[in-house]
Amino acid sequence: MIIENPVTPSERVKALRKAIDRKGYARILEAHNGLSGIIAESVQVEKNGETLGYDGIWESSLTDSASKGMPDASIVGNDSRIHTIDEILKVTSKPMVVDGDTGGEPAQFEYLVRHLERLGVSAVIIEDKIYPKRNSLDAKANQDLEDPYSFAEKIQAGKEVTISDEFMVISRLESLISGAGVADALNRAEQYIMAGTDGIMIHSNKSDPREILEFAQAYKGLCSRLGRRPILVSVPTTYNTLSDADLVANGFNLIIHANHMLRAAYKAMTEVAATILAGGSSLSADPVCAPVSSVFATVGFDRITQKDRERAETRRLLNGKTNEPAIVSGSRN
């Protein structure tokens, strides 16, 4: 993949804030490897005379872990995560937000923030659960929350090591996930805002969005009282009866479609594997598979072969000139 509009890491760090400042919100899509990153960056649709696309990329702990065949339970380490992050950054140019799980200890979080900012990541989101975390979408898992004052110290530690003011440290509230309720979420949000967080993500694993909307309404009053309003973040995986427009109307500034690329790929791969077995050959799978030529074009292989042909033609022309007989000037008698 040859990036059409390459950016430096420092430019890329600023890009998420710029997108939100420009239109009030940003909509980003999950990616878990280079190919899914290219798709998240490049897909566009025309709707009502407007060209729609994603404003950035979400690098998810769940889908990064699952793509490696691992559960989302703090098993895949930061070095492996950073390898995937860099893989996606190499072939894209839009801003990236990284799922930082719990962030670990403050010293570990400082290291992560420094590394992500150097790479060109725009923001990291950490959740206020005790390490090792369990994925929030599993309603049966124990979800133990970290002491809010300890978590606030972690936020401060991350903010203190940022190189620029553009890199964002965003706090993810797990109060609704744990059953602690909206009041606990607002109390934690206040502590984290006072600690300097750049954003608040309120998370829920319920299909009913009423708690999310209740929090969003109360958040306005909280920020007015504190005199500071960090961006508000939504991950509407379970309550997606609310449209992106609904979320923006309720004050959300960052909307993350957090795991759909991996889930779609998993379903498609499972089905095509079964189709080949049932059909006795891969012929029956052809209708649900992209042509190899499409994959070549997406990852930039066509560009390489085009350059190969151009260089071969240049060599042919040069060799042709070399093999031409020398023209000797006539001599005087």
Residue ranges of predicted features:
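Alpha/beta enzyme core
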Residues: 2-256, 311-330
